[in-house]
């Protein structure tokens, strides 16, 4: 029999499991693949052991263990991330190694909300995970429906505290579904996936977002003008489009694209992922520098001061050997450039140890084009000592 060709006919969506240790995240991940393999064409089951011994990956020098599985429902194709350890989650969410369009929060009905349940909800809010669906696991072990109701209320309250309102809750048992994918507990997994299909909207594709390109290099073509090169981060660019040049300098400059080139060929349009050179009308070589961005007018703003969720690398990951204190002044590497800034630790936090994850306020000496969720590295003398994501923009 000929091999079936992979047809990307369905919308794609990135999701993941979050929640307290031993509440059943990995079992649920395995159960989803097992139930879908039994009920929806085009799926294969991934067993618990393969997800649990997740391979280590290095993302920006940080060691993270993450398991990636894929599966599809009738409606969508999914990439699903699951992390074995709590520290892996924290790193994963802060480095943006796994961008999630939505998350399944696993809460054991036997335990209710625990420390990491809260921490993962907070992290989801900080890094901009837009949707959370709750899977109340181990319901087969709780006989009293009133107890389950109490746990549901507790989870809802916790989610609302961080601005996640009206999150759907599905009751089930991942282990039971894994044992019998076609049974009634398997139905609960299908109910979960139907909810994921309907509650998380189709993600906007990168090409549909407003154009943005970080400038990597600038040079002059004699007789033609100034060219900025870089990789298009999102959106599409057409000849004669108006653009703004922002960041690093205080003022915003306007220009028009009079030429687009890729691999020495002229293009009419460039889109997300392309490495291009853009010829900019009326801009001198010294008016634009690496680290600025080209963006569709009015879509991006520059800021000096913001709060961020930061993970500080351990000594083993090549980070600092010693803690840092308030008013620490490292470099912040955004997209293509380093900017010096000052860290203000939260009230009551005296210092930040290697391996910590902390929310801090940062003030940069130059403005940077930013929005919530933008990732950056913290560097000292060229080596990465931390990783962060913008949580809120202040000024």
From Swiss-Prot:
SUPFAM superfamilies given in the database record: EF-Tu/eEF-1alpha/eIF2-gamma C-terminal domain, P-loop containing nucleoside triphosphate hydrolases, Translation proteins
A GO cellular component entry from the record: cytosol
GO molecular function: GTP binding; GTPase activity; translation elongation factor activity
Annotated stretches, region: G1: 19-26
CDD domains, sorted: EF_Tu (cd01884), EFTU_II (cd03697), EFTU_III (cd03707)
Class of the enzyme per the UniProt entry, highest EC level: hydrolase
Domain tr-type G residues, every copy: 10-204
Signal peptide region: none
Region described as G2: 61-65
Annotated stretches, region: G4: 137-140
Binding site for Mg(2+): 26
Enzyme Commission number(s) from the entry: 3.6.5.3
Main localisation: cytoplasm
Region (G5): 173-175
Record key words, sorted: Cytoplasm, Elongation factor, GTP-binding, Hydrolase, Magnesium, Metal-binding, Nucleotide-binding, Protein biosynthesis
Reactions catalysed: GTP + H2O = GDP + phosphate + H(+)
Ranges for region G3: 82-85
The organism's place on the tree of life at top rank: Bacteria
Family matches, as InterPro entries: EF-Tu_GTP-bd (IPR041709), EF-Tu_GTPase (IPR050055), EFTu-like_2 (IPR004161), EFTU_2 (IPR033720), G_TR_CS (IPR031157), P-loop_NTPase (IPR027417), Small_GTP-bd (IPR005225), T_Tr_GTP-bd_dom (IPR000795)
Subcellular location: Cytoplasm
Keyword Lipoprotein on entry: no
Family affiliation: Belongs to the TRAFAC class translation factor GTPase superfamily. Classic translation factor GTPase family. EF-Tu/EF-1A subfamily.
Quaternary context: Monomer.
Cited function: GTP hydrolase that promotes the GTP-dependent binding of aminoacyl-tRNA to the A-site of ribosomes during protein biosynthesis.
Identification of the protein by name: Elongation factor Tu
């Amino acid at each position: 029999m000929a091999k079936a060709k992979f047809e990307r006919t369905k919308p794609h969506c990135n999701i993941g499991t979050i929640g307290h240790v031993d509440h059943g995240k990995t079992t649920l991940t395995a159960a989803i693949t097992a139930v879908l393999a039994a009920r929806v064409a085009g799926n294969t089951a991934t067993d618990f052991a393969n997800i649990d011994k997740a391979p280590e990956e290095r993302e920006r020098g940080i060691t993270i263990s993450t398991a990636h599985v894929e599966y599809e429902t009738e409606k969508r194709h999914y990439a699903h991330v699951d992390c074995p350890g709590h520290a892996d989650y924290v790193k994963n969410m802060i480095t943006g190694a796994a961008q999630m369009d939505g998350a399944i929060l696993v809460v054991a009905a036997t335990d209710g909300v625990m420390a990491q349940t809260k921490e993962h909800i907070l992290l989801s809010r900080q890094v901009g995970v837009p949707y959370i669906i709750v899977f109340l696991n181990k319901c087969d072990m709780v006989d009293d429906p009133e107890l389950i109701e109490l746990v549901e209320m507790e989870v809802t309250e916790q989610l609302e505290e961080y601005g996640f309102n009206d999150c759907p809750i599905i009751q089930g048992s991942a282990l039971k579904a894994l044992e019998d994918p076609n049974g009634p507990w398997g139905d609960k997994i299908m109910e979960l996936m139907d909810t994921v299909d309907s509650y998380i909207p189709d993600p906007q594709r990168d090409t549909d977002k407003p154009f943005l390109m970080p400038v990597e290099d600038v040079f002059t073509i004699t007789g033609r003008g100034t060219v900025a090169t870089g990789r298009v981060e999102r959106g599409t660019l057409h000849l004669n489009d108006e653009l703004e040049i922002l960041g690093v300098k205080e003022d915003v400059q306007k220009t028009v694209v009079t030429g687009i080139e890729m691999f020495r060929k002229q293009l009419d349009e460039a889109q997300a992922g392309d490495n291009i050179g853009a010829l900019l009308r009326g801009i001198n070589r010294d008016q634009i520098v690496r680290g600025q961005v080209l963006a569709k007018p009015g879509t991006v703003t520059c800021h000096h001061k913001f709060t961020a969720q930061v993970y500080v690398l351990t000594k083993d990951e090549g980070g600092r050997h010693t803690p840092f204190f308030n008013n620490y002044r490292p470099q912040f590497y955004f997209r293509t450039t380093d900017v010096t800034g000052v860290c203000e630790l939260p009230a009551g936090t005296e210092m930040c140890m290697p391996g910590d994850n902390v929310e801090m306020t940062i003030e940069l000496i130059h403005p940077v084009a930013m929005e919530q969720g933008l990732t950056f590295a913290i560097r000292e003398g060229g080596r990465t000592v931390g990783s962060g994501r913008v949580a809120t923009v202040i000024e």
